[in-house]
Every structure is written in C-alpha cells, then in structure tokens.
C-alpha cells in the first residue's frame, strides 16, 4: 500500500519513472478491458494508449476507490468514447417477443470446461452494441438505466441488447460444447 501511495504521488508530480511503473503494473489488465469493449486488438491498443495519456495529463485520482478501479473506469470511458466516435454502438431495438427463450446456463450445466480465452473470444464476436451492453452489465455491474444514460439509448434498448448478447453467447457456447464432444 505504501508503494502505491508513492506511485500516486510520483504520477501527480509528473515523474516519468512513476508513470512507467503505473503503465507496467496495469497495461496488460487494462488492454483486456479495452479489448472486451472494442472486440479488436488494434482498437484496444489505441484506446489503451489514449486512456493512459488522459491519466498522465490529468492525474485526477482522489482515492475514493482503489487505483485499479479508477484506472479501469478511465479505460471503460475511453472505450465507450471510441465506440461512439466510430458509431459502433448500435441503437438497434429488438422487441423481446422476437427473442428466443434462453435457458440459464448454470441450470443446464453448460459453461463448464470453457477457458477464459474462449469466453473472451465469444464476447469479442458479439455485435458492437451487444458487446458494450454486455460488458457494462456483467463486468461493470451497471443497471440498464445507467447503461442507457451512458450510451444515450433507451433503457429498453439496453435490455434488448443484453438479451441478444446472451442469445448469441448461448449459441456459441452450445456450438463449442458440440465440437468438444466430437
């Protein structure tokens, strides 16, 4: 903890050694966060770069959360800004009656034996809007109301896109399980 305090002080003072250490400590984890949102490694690297530039030019960490949580929040915001700029956050509205019922994977015993890499690949294959809502809902634990506000969409659109993401993921999971059984 004492080392983290020194790191924070160094970053606030603009010390290159502290910035380098911060980048070394968090860049791999934050690249994974950026990739979860963008679904494209080149874009994830761009977002990561922009996020760290933002952190280093305006080190506004106030200590209200852990340093890792704050950096993650910056990277999520950068990822959402990137998706908005690229117009990749779809505002597609799917009516719930058009969506199939999806069994709960935990009830059906599905998902066992799937690697984290495979799960991340499934997430990366989701359409941009669905992937964004899925990440915010599942990993960032945001409500549909919060997601709607962040993405400037209707709350129902958030719900629909999460359902669509689950449906696509379920289809991928079943196909993966079938290929493993062969």
Language model features with spans:
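A short pre-motif secondary-structure segment
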Residues: 133-137
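Conserved RNAP core-binding helix
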Residues: 7, 23, 31, 41-58
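Internal acidic/polar
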Residues: 1, 81, 89-116
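Helix-turn-helix DNA-binding motif, specifically the short coil turn and the N-cap/start of the second
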Residues: 40, 143, 153-157
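Arg/Lys-rich amphipathic alpha helix in sigma70-family domain 2
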Residues: 62, 73-94
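A short, charge-rich alpha-helical start-of-domain segment used by transcription regulators
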Residues: 8-32
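Conserved small/polar residues in nucleotide/adenosyl-binding loops
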Residues: 171-178
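Sigma70-family region 2
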Residues: 12-13, 49-67, 86
């Amino acid at each position: 903890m004492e080392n983290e305090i020194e790191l924070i002080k160094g970053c606030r003072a603009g010390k290159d050694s502290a910035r380098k250490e911060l980048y070394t400590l968090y860049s791999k984890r934050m690249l994974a966060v950026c990739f979860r949102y963008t679904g494209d490694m080149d874009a994830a690297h761009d977002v990561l770069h922009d996020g760290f530039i933002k952190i280093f030019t305006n080190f506004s960490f106030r200590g209200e959360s852990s340093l890792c949580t704050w950096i993650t929040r910056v990277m999520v915001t950068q990822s959402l800004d990137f998706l908005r700029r690229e117009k990749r956050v779809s505002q597609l509205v799917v009516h719930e009656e058009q969506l199939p019922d999806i069994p709960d994977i935990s009830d059906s015993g599905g998902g066992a034996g799937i690697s984290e890499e495979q799960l991340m690949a499934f997430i990366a294959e989701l359409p941009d809007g669905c992937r964004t809502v899925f990440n915010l809902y599942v990993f960032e634990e945001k409500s549909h109301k919060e997601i709607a506000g962040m993405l400037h969409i209707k709350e129902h659109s958030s719900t629909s896109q999460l359902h669509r993401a689950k449906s696509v993921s379920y289809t991928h999971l079943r196909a993966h399980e079938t290929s493993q059984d062969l």
